[in-house]
C-alpha cells in the first residue's frame, strides 16, 4: 500500500495536470502553442529593474523570466527602498534556480512608504561579495549591446532617471523599455464589473515622478503595460494548482505569497516580462503620454512617444505563464 503522503503527492500531481488542462496549458498531441513557442530566433537580452520584496508580483515576474528560454537575463538591478536587501532576495532566487552567475546590481537607496513584506525570506539570501552599482551597470551593458538590450522596468524609475541624467546618449541606445507603470484609461480595481473609475496615479510612476518624466522625454522606444492591462488575478484555483506543484520555483512563490500575507496576488509586473517575450499577449496602441506632477500618465494630442497596452486577455496570459512557472527549474547551460 502507498503511504498517506505518497497518495497526497499523487493527488496533487493529478490536480496540477487537470488544472493545466482547464487553463489550456497543455496542448493536445500533434498541436503546438503558437504563443511563446521557441524557434531559432535569437534570445531577447534583458535587464530587469525591480523593487522585489514589497508586493509579490515581482517574484512571479522574475520567475517567469528565469523559466523562459527565449530570454537571456543580462542582469537584475534593484530599485527603491532597501535595494541591498532586495538584491539579497534576488540572489537567493537565482541561487536556488541554479542561475547564480547572473549579475545583481544594487540601485539607489530611497525611503519607501511600502512595507518590505518578504524581508525575512530576503535576509536568508547571500550578501554581495562586491557591490555593483545599478546605474553604472545598466549604462555599461547598453554600451556593450547598443541597440540590442531591452530594459524591463517593473518598479519605481529612480535608477532609470539617474541613468538618463548620467548619460542620456548611451541610454538612448537601448532597444526598448518595457515598463509596468502608469494608468491611461483605467485605474486600480477597474476590472470591467462596474462603471469606470478612470485613470489614477499608479505606484511606480508616482514614487518618482521626475524619473518618469525623464523616461517619456528620453526618445527611447517605450512599451507601457499600465493598470489598464495588468490587473491579472491569480485566483484560488490557479494558486492551488501552482503551489502544489513540487518545484523549486513553485515552492519559492508559495513561501513568498505567504509572507506577503494576502490571498490573491495581482500579477501586474509579470505582464511586462510576458510582453518582452511575446508581444501578442498585450497588443499596443501608439500614444503621446505626459507625466504630470501628481504622477498621472496623461494621454495627450501630439506625436506618439510610447506604445501602451490598453487591454489584455487574462486567460491567454495564464495559458502562457502557468506552464512556465510549473515546469521543473532548468539552469542555463
Language-model region placement:
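N-terminal secretory signal peptides that target proteins for export/translocation
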Residues: 1-8
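Position-driven detector of the extreme protein N-terminus
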Residues: 2, 13-16, 323-327
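Bacterial N-terminal signal peptides
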Residues: 12-25
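N-terminal acidic, glycine/proline-rich low-complexity segments
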Residues: 28-333
Amino acid at each position: 500500500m502507498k503511504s498517506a503522503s505518497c497518495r497526497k503527492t499523487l493527488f496533487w500531481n493529478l490536480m496540477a495536470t487537470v488544472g493545466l488542462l482547464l487553463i489550456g496549458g497543455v496542448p493536445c498531441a500533434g498541436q503546438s502553442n503558437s504563443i511563446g513557442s521557441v524557434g531559432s530566433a535569437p534570445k531577447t537580452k534583458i535587464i530587469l529593474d525591480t523593487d522585489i520584496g514589497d508586493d509579490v508580483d515581482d517574484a512571479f515576474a522574475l520567475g517567469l523570466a528565469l523559466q523562459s528560454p527565449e530570454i537571456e537575463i543580462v542582469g537584475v538591478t534593484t530599485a527603491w527602498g532597501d535595494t541591498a536587501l532586495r538584491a539579497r532576495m534576488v540572489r537567493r532566487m537565482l541561487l536556488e534556480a541554479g542561475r547564480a552567475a547572473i549579475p545583481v546590481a544594487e540601485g539607489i537607496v530611497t525611503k519607501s512608504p511600502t512595507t518590505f513584506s518578504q524581508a525575512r525570506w530576503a535576509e536568508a539570501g547571500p550578501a554581495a561579495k562586491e557591490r555593483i552599482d545599478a546605474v553604472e551597470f545598466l549604462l555599461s551593458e547598453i554600451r556593450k549591446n547598443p541597440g540590442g538590450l531591452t530594459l524591463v522596468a517593473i518598479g519605481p524609475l529612480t535608477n532609470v532617471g539617474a541613468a538618463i541624467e548620467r548619460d542620456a546618449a548611451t541610454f538612448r541606445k537601448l532597444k526598448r523599455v518595457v515598463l509596468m507603470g502608469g494608468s491611461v484609461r483605467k485605474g486600480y480595481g477597474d476590472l470591467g464589473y462596474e462603471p469606470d473609475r478612470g485613470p489614477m496615479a499608479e505606484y511606480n510612476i508616482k514614487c518618482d515622478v521626475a524619473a518618469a518624466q525623464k523616461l517619456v522625454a528620453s526618445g527611447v522606444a517605450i512599451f507601457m503595460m499600465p493598470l489598464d492591462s495588468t490587473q491579472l488575478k491569480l485566483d484560488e484555483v490557479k494558486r492551488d494548482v501552482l503551489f502544489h506543484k513540487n518545484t523549486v520555483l513553485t515552492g519559492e512563490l508559495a513561501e513568498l505569497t505567504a509572507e506577503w500575507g494576502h490571498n490573491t496576488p495581482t500579477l501586474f509586473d509579470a505582464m511586462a516580462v510576458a510582453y518582452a517575450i511575446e508581444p501578442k499577449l498585450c497588443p499596443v496602441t501608439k500614444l503621446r503620454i505626459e507625466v504630470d506632477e501628481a504622477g498621472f500618465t496623461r494621454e495627450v494630442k501630439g506625436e506618439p512617444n510610447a506604445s501602451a497596452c490598453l487591454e489584455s486577455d487574462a486567460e491567454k496570459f495564464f495559458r502562457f505563464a502557468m506552464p512556465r512557472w510549473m515546469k521543473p527549474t532548468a539552469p542555463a547551460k
